[in-house]
Amino acid sequence: RDTFMDNAWWGTAPDADIVLVALDQATCTHADITNAIEYIFDYATEVGKPCVVNLSLGNHDGPHDGTSSFDRMADTMQGPGRIIVGAAGNHRKDAFHLSRTFTTAGDDPLRTFIAFKQQPTKDSYGGEVQIWAEQGMDIEVTLSAYSVFNKKDMTTVTIYPAEGQQTVKLGSYATGTMTVASEVNPTNGKLNILIT
């Protein structure tokens, strides 16, 4: 109970048990998270209480349409007295997601800047871009090295449709390596392109 300034309000669930599961962030997989959820639900069954599992994961991968293997797993684990809640996240000001609806092949391209992490450590170097396109869309993805001094693209290369590792000349003295992989997702039929 909050007694500050004679507050008469109690907490939302004053008789709730709090069950914490620690996972190693560096090696955590969706299977580990699934096992943690199962552990919490098993505890709730043992003590005869309903259960809400809060997942504040900060994960931005996947199609965001409920068809990922993790989303489908979460759906099957929920039921009467068992709810999984996904937190909205702390990235409101970060430009993590971008979308565009194209109506014809003549539409202007979608352009954006991508800032990859630049510290040369194992945990913070690099980055990835996931592109999801609706079934049957014919798309092309190009990468450009943009000069902040000249305010223009210095070089542009088509990276999809193409597969494998490519070395891209970014300027007179700089090169970068990226890997492009793609598939038509067997669950939702959408084209998925991963650039790392």
Model region roles, listed by residue range:
Residues R1-A31, G48-K49, G79-I83, F96, ...:
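Subtilisin-like serine protease catalytic core
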Residues R1-T3, D42-Y43, A145-F149:
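Short regulatory "switch" loops immediately downstream of catalytic or recognition motifs
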Residues D2-F4, Y39, T76, T179:
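Residue-level detector of functional hotspots within protein domains
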Residues A22, I37-D65, A87-A88:
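Short acidic, glycine-rich surface-loop motifs adjacent to enzyme active sites
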Residues A26-T34, P63, T67:
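Solvent-exposed, acidic/flexible segments
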Residues T34-I37, D71:
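Extracytoplasmic/secreted envelope proteins and their assembly/folding machinery
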Residues G58-T196:
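Substrate-binding/specificity loop regions of serine endopeptidase catalytic domains
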